[in-house]
Swiss-Prot record:
Protein name (Swiss-Prot/TrEMBL): Haptoglobin
InterPro entries linked: Peptidase_S1_PA, Peptidase_S1_PA_chymotrypsin, Peptidase_S1A, Sushi/SCR/CCP_sf, Sushi_SCR_CCP_dom, Trypsin_dom
Gene giving rise to this polypeptide: HP
Gene Ontology CC annotation, any one: extracellular space
Record carries keyword Secreted: yes
Function: As a result of hemolysis, hemoglobin is found to accumulate in the kidney and is secreted in the urine. Haptoglobin captures, and combines with free plasma hemoglobin to allow hepatic recycling of heme iron and to prevent kidney damage. Haptoglobin also acts as an antioxidant, has antibacterial activity and plays a role in modulating many aspects of the acute phase response. Hemoglobin/haptoglobin complexes are rapidly cleared by the macrophage CD163 scavenger receptor expressed on the surface of liver Kupfer cells through an endocytic lysosomal degradation pathway.
């Protein structure tokens, strides 16, 4: 007959004895267990957490062995009690039942994208169901066009004002081959708009997009370097000076980094004012070390065309731009004039957005992307690609890539 193995577990013995006798519990409070033939006594203790706390690891049971307290799961390591965030069983009511609900909420600077309200009910089939979208889980998307510190006054990137508050969190700096600086505009967590000319800076016109990608360095927020995965040029970029940049990873959205919203209506009206930020050259023709911005008005397109091309010029005309370079002017572009302080954009600002504030929804939208940044307060107009004219291409490109 095999020997009988006995294990005696003493649970909270000291506490129980102290209650019964009214004396203070000590290490010797527990009496020795009676011995029986062909056995040995093994002592164990169980740690228990206070109400609303639970053990972080192990089952709390420790056996005394070779003068050491050992837990089978975590050895000599002592357990820890952490806050128990599980819901206790609710009390029952007469003629009623308990329905379990959960609500999904997004982190700051994110919002629910789906039409549901984030509330899910646990049904009899053990499924979490939302009344609007069923079993489909909600998605949190980045908030756009809601800077924590928006521009709140008319200030004066030729001269311009410093963006000390972070009013333009969608502004990115692009450094291309030969350390040439230009702008780019964040439009979601992973994509940016810039100009095709910017992407070709330092490259010959026959370069492929895949060859341009590894030469780019891109910075968002407070000089946060992000890795570029690919660039996509507009199929007609000789007439539509636009390209897209895809990042290898999504950027976390916060008060320093936030996309600008794409417009659902046309904000380009003569006289409408908007803001442009950038890292381009200043009044001394040096690249600025700090992000600057300027407020500029939408200009009359016909006057802008005449300014650059000359009145009644023949079709085979040569460029008459005051700066010796002809901008792209067509149905996909619009012109912006100088500020009342004669401030302007300049070399290096291209790719930045002309943003407008919609008071109805208190949101900022990208109305245009600066294409011609060579006016530098010498010419009267800067030229921008109209964002509404490229929306379909932008959406299809993002969806397919």
């Amino acid at each position: 007959m095999s020997a009988l193995q006995a294990v005696v577990t003493l649970l909270l013995c000291g506490q129980l004895l102290a209650v019964e006798t009214g004396s203070e519990a000590t290490a010797d409070s527990c009496p020795k267990a009676p011995e029986i033939a062909n056995s040995h006594v093994e002592y164990s203790v169980r740690y228990q957490c206070d109400k609303y706390y639970k053990l972080h690891a192990g089952n709390g049971v420790y056996t005394f062995n070779n003068k050491q307290w050992i837990n089978k799961d975590i050895g000599q390591q002592l357990p820890e009690c952490e806050e128990d965030d599980s819901c206790p069983e609710p009390p029952k009511i007469e003629n009623g039942y308990v329905e379990y609900l959960v609500r999904y909420q997004c982190k700051p600077y994110y919002t629910l994208r789906t039409c549901g309200d984030g509330v899910y009910t646990f049904n009899s089939k053990k499924q979490w169901i939302n009344k609007n979208i069923g079993q489909k889980l909600p998605e949190c998307e980045a908030v756009c066009g809601k800077p924590k510190h928006p521009v709140d006054q008319v200030q004066r990137i030729i001269g311009g004002s410093l963006d000390a508050k972070g009013s333009f969190p969608w502004q990115a700096k692009m450094v291309s081959q030969h350390n040439l600086i230009s702008g780019a505009t964040l439009i979601n967590e992973r994509w940016l708009l810039t100009t095709a000319k910017n992407l070709y800076l330092g490259h010959s016109s026959d370069k492929k997009a895949k060859d341009i990608t590894p030469t780019l360095r891109l910075y968002v927020g407070k000089n946060q370097l992000v890795e570029v995965e690919k660039v996509v040029l507009h199929p007609d970029h000789s007439k539509v000076d636009i390209g897209l940049i895809k990042l290898r990873q999504k950027v976390p959205v916060n008060d320093k980094v936030m996309p600008i919203c794409l417009p659902s209506k046309d904000y380009v009206k003569v006289g409408r004012v908007g803001y442009v930020s950038g890292w381009g050259r200043n009044e001394n023709f040096n690249f600025t070390e700090h992000l600057k911005y300027v407020m500029l008005p939408v200009a009359d397109q016909d006057k802008c065309v005449k300014h650059y091309e000359g009145v009644d010029a023949p079709k085979n005309k040569t460029a008459k731009s005051p700066v010796g370079v002809q901008p792209i002017l067509n149905e996909n572009t619009f012109c912006v004039g100088l500020s009342k302080y004669q401030d302007d954009t300049c070399y290096g600002d291209a790719g930045s957005a002309f943003v407008v504030h919609d008071k109805e929804d208190d949101t900022w939208y990208a109305a245009g992307i600066l294409s011609f940044d060579k006016s530098c307060a010498v010419a009267e107009y800067g030229v921008y690609v109209k964002v509404t004219s490229i929306l379909d291409w932008v959406r299809k490109t993002i969806a397919n890539n």
